[in-house]
């Protein structure tokens, strides 16, 4: 009893209450901090567009060494955003730049989209390119990033539509949100509802693979308890109006799911506008045609021509006079080039189904003809020009330089070390093919006859716009699948195509090599290979020159592989387009070679 009476003394009770308040206050603060940690970022940080481009760690280390940490960080940031303008090439065979500018201005003025694109000073967003020689190029200026007001907050989170990464990348370039791109949606979304559009990004798996880890049709909750809540933070690309109910989005096969009327980046959608008169094309791709410098009456080969943008750009510079052979290994891709050529009204383009790795037909296997595909999809026989110097090219193809032997040595020593990585990359790629089904590039009808290739020295100029890792394309929201080994393999594959291209250019001709990647293994390293192996090749000046210099030096990898780049003095003879530069283009690389005597 005495102890109980002591506890009830006023002074002791006051002390206990004070301590209790302090204790519960600390508990409350702890819970608040814990709650904030569970909540993650604030609404302003969550409902915004601030993606971080994820790379394979070894690839990130390689690029950091090549470009420097600050420069590579700027490149990575720029890749997650679209260019601030759309670049249009005018088909001068049919129309003029002034006529196109007038038509585009009217089209944009008649649309709600156009009002949002008017420049701050009130000027039109449609302008003519001021680079000398490119007056047939038109820019349509966009804007962004814009701050979007989302109806956010825990008490009233916005209804959300989650789209695939590839859908989001198209939307950032001006497209609408179409049904096939929708992966998940908030419950009870009805037609006409305001919805926030966010992006589903690939997440790392337990076995080193990447996947979205979500079944199409998943219901989003919009609360911290949602298992996908954190993954969407900083990946909101705009607010729009649902054109279908939730049920409709997962029931119908196509159509617009969300009309995105408030975008982080505002770029006009120019799909199906002025067909035959204009072609939407990145500025560096137009520069490639100028680097080739085609002349009227010449015979040109575009080795990897699809979808035909560079082929038709070359035709414009030749004023549709001469012969352009547009080759591609896929039947359906060849048809795409045909259709574009017909749409733009060119007669100098002949399409040909041909694997770039089998482009050269040597005298021992030469057939008198090659099968080409005409515009009416029928096959005809077209004779090749005669082989000008069999002995000349025999010595070229048989001679093995020290650089070639070194490359083969590196190739043979690398494969065992990177075998597991190569297998994993192969498995991932084929998983995607199986999941996505037949692609549009897979032939769905009759097969076109295969070309037998061309004799050496058949062309005045050759363009090799090689298949590549495409790590310069933007916007790009994910880059984690490429490994150092896969990037190196891209370069070896391109060297094999270059070996073919070199043989097809006549003495005194021009060879242009280009890629849409920032990977030095596919750019500077391929140029080094070509110059060391073929002593009759030399880098030639390019006009216009608006890109930056290439990389000089070398890179030594942890596995002992040494990759040689450009030598001092060569860097200014190539053009490297940096996504983070003021030009605001995609990442791109162009090298132009003059072909000397092949002896």
From Swiss-Prot:
Basic residues bias locations: 428-438
BP-aspect Gene Ontology terms: RNA methylation; rRNA processing
Listed Low complexity bias regions: 378-388
Intracellular or extracellular location(s): Nucleus, Nucleolus
Biased composition (Basic and acidic residues): 399-412
Catalysed conversion reaction: a cytidine in rRNA + S-adenosyl-L-methionine = a 5-methylcytidine in rRNA + S-adenosyl-L-homocysteine + H(+)
Positions of region (Disordered): 372-454
EC number assigned by the record: 2.1.1.-
Biased composition (Polar residues): 413-424
GO CC annotations on file: nucleolus
Catalytic class of the enzyme: transferase
SUPFAM superfamilies reported for this sequence: PUA domain-like (SSF88697), S-adenosyl-L-methionine-dependent methyltransferases (SSF53335)
Sites where the protein binds S-adenosyl-L-methionine: 304-310, 328, 355, 465
Residues annotated as the enzyme's active site: 516
Loss of function: phenotype: Normal levels of methylation at cytosine 2860 of 25S rRNA.
A Pfam family per the record: Methyltr_RsmB-F
GO MF annotation terms: RNA binding; RNA methyltransferase activity
Start and end residues of each PUA domain: 158-265
Key words of the record: Methyltransferase, Nucleus, Ribosome biogenesis, RNA-binding, rRNA processing, S-adenosyl-L-methionine, Transferase
Job of this protein: Involved in ribosomal large subunit assembly. S-adenosyl-L-methionine-dependent methyltransferase that may methylates the C(5) position of cytosine in rRNA. May play a role in the regulation of the cell cycle and the increased nucleolar activity that is associated with the cell proliferation. Seems involved in the regulation of cell proliferation.
PANTHER family: NOP2 YEAST -RELATED NOL1/NOP2/FMU SUN DOMAIN-CONTAINING (PTHR22807), TRNA (CYTOSINE(72)-C(5))-METHYLTRANSFERASE NSUN6 (PTHR22807:SF34)
Family the entry assigns: Belongs to the class I-like SAM-binding methyltransferase superfamily. RsmB/NOP family.
Name under which the protein is recorded: rRNA (cytosine-C(5))-methyltransferase NOP2C
Organism: Arabidopsis thaliana
Taxonomic lineage of the native organism: Eukaryota, Viridiplantae, Streptophyta, Embryophyta, Tracheophyta
Gene: NOP2C
């Amino acid at each position: 009893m005495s102890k109980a009476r002591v506890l009830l003394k006023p002074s002791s009770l006051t002390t206990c209450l004070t301590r209790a308040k302090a204790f519960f206050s600390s508990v409350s603060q702890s819970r608040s901090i814990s709650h904030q940690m569970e909540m993650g970022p604030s609404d302003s940080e969550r409902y915004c567009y601030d993606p971080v481009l994820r790379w394979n760690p070894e690839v990130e280390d390689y690029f950091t060494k090549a470009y420097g940490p600050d420069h590579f960080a700027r490149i990575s940031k720029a890749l997650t955003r679209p260019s601030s303008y759309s670049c249009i090439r005018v088909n001068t065979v049919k129309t003029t730049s002034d006529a196109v500018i007038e038509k585009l201005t009217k089209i944009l003025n008649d649309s709600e989209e156009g009002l949002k694109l008017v420049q701050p000073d009130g000027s039109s967003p449609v302008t003519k390119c001021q680079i000398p020689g490119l007056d047939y190029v038109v820019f349509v200026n966009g804007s962004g990033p814009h701050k979007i007001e989302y109806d956010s907050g825990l008490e009233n989170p916005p209804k959300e539509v989650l789209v695939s990464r590839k859908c989001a990348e198209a939307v950032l370039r001006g497209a609408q949100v179409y049904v096939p791109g929708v992966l998940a949606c908030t419950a009870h979304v009805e037609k006409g509802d305001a919805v926030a559009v966010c992006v589903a990004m690939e997440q790392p798996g337990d076995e080193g693979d990447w996947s979205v880890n979500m079944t199409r049709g998943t219901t989003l909750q919009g609360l911290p308890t949602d298992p996908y809540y954190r993954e969407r933070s900083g990946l909101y690309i705009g607010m729009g109006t649902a054109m279908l109910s939730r049920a409709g989005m997962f029931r119908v096969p196509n159509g617009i799911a969300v009309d995105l009327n408030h975008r982080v980046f505002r770029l006009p959608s120019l799909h199906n506008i002025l067909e035959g008169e204009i072609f939407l094309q990145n500025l560096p791709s137009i520069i490639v045609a100028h680097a080739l410098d085609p002349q009227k009456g010449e015979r040109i080969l575009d080795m990897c021509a699809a979808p035909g943008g560079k082929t038709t750009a070359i035709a414009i510079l030749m004023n549709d006079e001469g012969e352009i052979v547009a080759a591609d290994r896929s039947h359906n891709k060849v048809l795409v080039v045909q259709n574009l050529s017909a749409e733009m009204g060119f007669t100098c383009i002949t399409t040909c189904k041909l694997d770039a790795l089998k482009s050269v037909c040597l005298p021992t296997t030469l057939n008198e003809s090659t099968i080409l595909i005409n515009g009416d999809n029928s096959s005809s026989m077209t004779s090749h020009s005669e082989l000008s110097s069999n002995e000349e090219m025999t010595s070229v193809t048989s001679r093995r330089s020290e650089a070639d032997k070194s490359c083969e040595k590196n190739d043979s020593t690398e494969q065992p070390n990177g075998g597991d990585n190569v297998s994993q990359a192969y498995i991932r790629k084929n998983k995607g093919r199986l999941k996505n089904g037949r692609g549009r590039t897979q032939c769905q009808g009759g097969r076109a006859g295969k070309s037998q290739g061309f004799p050496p020295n058949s062309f005045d100029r050759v363009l090799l716009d090689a298949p590549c890792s495409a790590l310069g394309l933007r916007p790009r929201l994910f880059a984690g699948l490429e490994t150092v080994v896969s990037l190196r393999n891209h370069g070896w594959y391109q060297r094999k195509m270059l070996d073919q291209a070199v043989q097809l250019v006549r003495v005194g001709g021009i060879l242009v090599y280009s890629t849409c990647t920032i990977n030095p293994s596919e750019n500077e390293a391929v140029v080094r290979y070509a110059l060391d192996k073929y002593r009759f090749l030399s880098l030639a000046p390019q006009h216009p020159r608006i890109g930056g210099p290439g990389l000089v030096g070398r890179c030594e990898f942890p596995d002992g592989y040494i990759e040689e780049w450009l030598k001092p003095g060569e860097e200014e003879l190539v053009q490297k387009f940096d996504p983070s530069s003021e030009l605001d283009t995609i990442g791109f690389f162009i090298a132009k070679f003059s072909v000397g005597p092949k002896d």
